[in-house]
Amino acid sequence: MDKATFDKGLEIRKAVLGREFVENAFKTADDFNMPMQELATEYCWGWCWGREGLSLKTRSLINLAMISALNRPHELKVHVKGALNNGVTREEIREVFLQVAIYCGVPAAVDSFRQAREVFAQIDQEK
């Protein structure tokens, strides 16, 4: 493991997903899934998200589209919240999901809208 890349990834991951969420992911990891937490932090967040070629906002928009296409509702909710943290608006999220409907299918988009609305409701309730 490259410590500098891991540390950079940990910083970005906490900034996007929230410190509490990330700390909980590591706290609840066991011997079985800790290597996945380390891999995601170093390579996904440190190497990929840490590159300078795209802004965090743009990376969030791309992730929303890809995760919608893959039908990964849990991860989508995490990344909807992260996208909002990166300055993506609810209107921009809606536009991503409308494009998902055309290129990935209406069922994928319907599920994505459903997941996003749950995140929005949770955020609105916490205000």
Q: Where are the regions that the model predicts?
A:
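Short alpha-helical scaffolding segments that buttress acidic/His motifs in well-ordered protein cores
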Residues: 40-44, 61-68, 96-101
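Residues at alpha-helix boundaries and short interhelical turns
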Residues: 52, 70-73, 87, 104-107, ...
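Substrate/cofactor-recognition hotspot
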Residues: 99, 106-110
